[in-house]
């Protein structure tokens, strides 16, 4: 039996810049969603989703009902801050899924990705837990949002490492004024500093588009699904395969293609799910 899957990414996408990271609405996660079902259930899902879209047709923009219909300020406190109309919309949306649905979600920290790239040549050892080192750096950046460190992140890996070392040194000094609460953090930061003083810094960084598809391939294997198609929301120049599609193929996925969401309800469903 063949299965039909549809892919979309959050509008946050892979964008990481100084204004987004220091902004109040910054979200560190890159999200991707792939939804699907057996091909013989396609018509039933399409009918349900079209009925959902027609119910909320007054919210459509350019002919599509998009996840952006729910504004960020409605989600400041999660479901608690949603108005009744949006609670109803979300409930109706999830009602379009049933026990025949397959849902795969992928989430990655954008800053963590950059840190992993810088330390990709380092592994755990009896002397250092590199996973803990990476975690400590990501947590420090996301928690304190040091402008000088974040700004350097978009210049070069070498400048980023230098700025991070300065920040950690200053943070350790400040923490010594309250060691009762900050002793554990200082221990972690001192370990990170030791690594940074000896790290072989790469010349440049580039986003890897493969991770979400490697995970999805494992998802398919776990479900015993061999015959399938994956349709990806088209991005970039017409007639040119996007990096997303190329990465899906390079990750081992078969029968992949991309298309405009306005022509495929499954892509629109994935968009509503991933936000």
Language model: regions and residue ranges:
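Phosphate-ester processing/binding pockets and catalytic centers
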Residues: 1-275
């Amino acid at each position: 039996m063949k299965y039909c899957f549809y892919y979309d990414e959050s509008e946050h996408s892979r964008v990481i810049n100084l204004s987004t990271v220091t902004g109040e609405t910054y979200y560190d996660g890159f999200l991707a969603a792939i939804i699907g079902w057996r091909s013989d259930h396609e018509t039933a899902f399409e009918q349900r989703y079209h009925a959902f879209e027609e119910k909320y047709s007054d919210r459509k923009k350019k002919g599509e009902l998009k996840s952006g219909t729910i504004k960020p300020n409605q989600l400041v406190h999660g479901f608690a801050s949603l108005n009744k109309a949006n609670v109803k919309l979300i409930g109706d949306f999830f009602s379009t899924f049933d026990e025949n649905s397959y849902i795969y979600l992928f989430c990655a920290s954008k800053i963590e990705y950059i840190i992993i790239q810088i330390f990709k040549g380092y592994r755990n050892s009896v002397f250092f837990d590199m996973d803990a080192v990476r975690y400590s750096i990501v947590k420090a950046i996301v928690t304190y949002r040091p402008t000088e460190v974040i700004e350097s992140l978009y210049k070069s890996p070498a400048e980023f490492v230098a700025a991070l070392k300065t920040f950690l040194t200053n943070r350790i000094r400040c923490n010594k004024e309250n060691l009762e609460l900050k002793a554990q953090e200082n221990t972690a930061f001192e370990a990170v500093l030791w690594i940074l003083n000896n790290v072989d810094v790469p010349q440049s960084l580039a986003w890897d588009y493969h991770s979400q598809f490697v995970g999805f391939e494992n998802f398919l294997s776990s479900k015993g699904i061999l015959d399938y198609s994956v349709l990806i929301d088209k991005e970039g120049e017409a007639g040119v395969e996007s990096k997303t599609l190329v990465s899906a193929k390079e990750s081992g996925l078969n029968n992949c293609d991309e298309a405009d969401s306005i022509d495929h309800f499954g892509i629109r469903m994935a968009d509503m799910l991933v936000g």
